[in-house]
């Protein structure tokens, strides 16, 4: 889908660049596949802010998206493509041959009326699902499982994908968008194709108010705060903080490594950080 620009009637309109969503379904979502979603405003059960700069925004309902795709060898037809406020990608409503409805992540080049299927050996075409070990090397995939049967966790944002670049015994080697190469078990499943809405990265919000509609509040700098609020706070006049940049909780920011999960290090063949040097 193309990008939309607007006549510069206001500064916000002048800078606004949106994805043209005119081809998407304009009605309400399927009620059986939606549930209520309560806004937390970034507060936890004690009422304290646990996530800063969240709150407000338009009320949303959650669409239950099927990331597992575990109805094996039951063909499904794409009924329509829909907007989902909970994610950057579009979703597709599919109807299985037995009459069941489900929402899935819509891949690129999936159209209304297409037939998709999940199985051990299926055609390599967008929307089909099969174990990574049965896919040809070089296949573009998204919604990749990390644990067998848990449901897709990798490559789910708009326009993202991963590529199968090799095999290693029971595992396959997957190259992610970040440049990281990692081992994933061959029995983990993935969906063929790249995620829809690749133009999302080229959009421009245009004005602060539109960000407020999305539920984001103003982001304050630490150096503009008082010492009680941030390690960079305080000082007479404008100061640069006087110490190496840290988070509000005193941990070094600007590139300090925080990953501690050593048990899964063996699955990462090429770090996304090493690639950038």
Swiss-Prot record:
PROSITE patterns: RIBOSOMAL_L2. The keyword Cell inner membrane does not apply. Keywords: Ribonucleoprotein, Ribosomal protein, RNA-binding, rRNA-binding. One of its GO terms (molecular function) is structural constituent of ribosome. GO terms for biological process: cytoplasmic translation. Coiled coil: none annotated. InterPro entries: NA-bd_OB-fold, Rib_uL2_dom2, Ribosomal_uL2, Ribosomal_uL2_bac/org-type, Ribosomal_uL2_C, Ribosomal_uL2_CS, Ribosomal_uL2_dom3, Ribosomal_uL2_RNA-bd_dom. SMART domains: Ribosomal_L2, Ribosomal_L2_C. Belongs to the universal ribosomal protein uL2 family. HAMAP family: Ribosomal_uL2_B. One of the primary rRNA binding proteins. Required for association of the 30S and 50S subunits to form the 70S ribosome, for tRNA binding and peptide bond formation. It has been suggested to have peptidyltransferase activity; this is somewhat controversial. Makes several contacts with the 16S rRNA in the 70S ribosome. This is Large ribosomal subunit protein uL2. It comes from Bradyrhizobium sp. (strain ORS 278). The lineage of its organism: Bacteria, Pseudomonadati, Pseudomonadota, Alphaproteobacteria, Hyphomicrobiales. The gene is rplB.
């Amino acid at each position: 889908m193309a990008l939309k620009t607007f006549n510069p009637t206001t500064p916000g309109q002048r800078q606004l660049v949106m994805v043209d969503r005119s081809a998407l379904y304009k009605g309400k979502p399927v009620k059986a596949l939606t549930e209520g979603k309560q806004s937390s405003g970034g507060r936890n059960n004690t009422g304290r802010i646990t996530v800063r700069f969240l709150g407000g925004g338009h009320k949303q309902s959650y669409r239950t998206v099927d990331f597992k795709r575990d109805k094996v060898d039951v063909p499904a037809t794409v009924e329509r493509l829909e907007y989902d406020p909970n994610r950057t990608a579009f979703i597709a409503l599919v109807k299985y041959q037995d009459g069941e409805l489900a929402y899935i992540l819509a891949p690129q080049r999936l159209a209304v009326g297409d037939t998709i299927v999940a199985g051990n050996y299926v055609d390599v075409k967008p929307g089909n699902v099969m174990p990574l070990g049965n896919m040809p090397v070089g296949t573009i995939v998204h919604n990749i499982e990390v644990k067998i049967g848990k449901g897709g966790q990798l490559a789910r944002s708009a326009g993202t994908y991963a590529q199968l670049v090799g095999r290693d015994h029971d595992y396959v080697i997957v190259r992610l968008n970040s440049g990281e190469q990692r081992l994933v078990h061959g029995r983990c499943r993935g969906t063929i194709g790249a995620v829809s809405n690749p133009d999302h990265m080229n959009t421009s919000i245009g004005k602060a108010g539109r960000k407020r509609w999305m539920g984001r509040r103003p982001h304050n700098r630490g150096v503009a705060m008082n010492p009680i609020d941030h390690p960079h706070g305080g000082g007479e006049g404008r100061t640069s903080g006087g110490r190496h940049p840290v988070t509000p909780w005193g941990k070094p920011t600007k590139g300090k490594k925080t990953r501690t999960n050593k048990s899964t290090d063996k699955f990462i063949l090429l770090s996304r950080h090493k690639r950038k040097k």
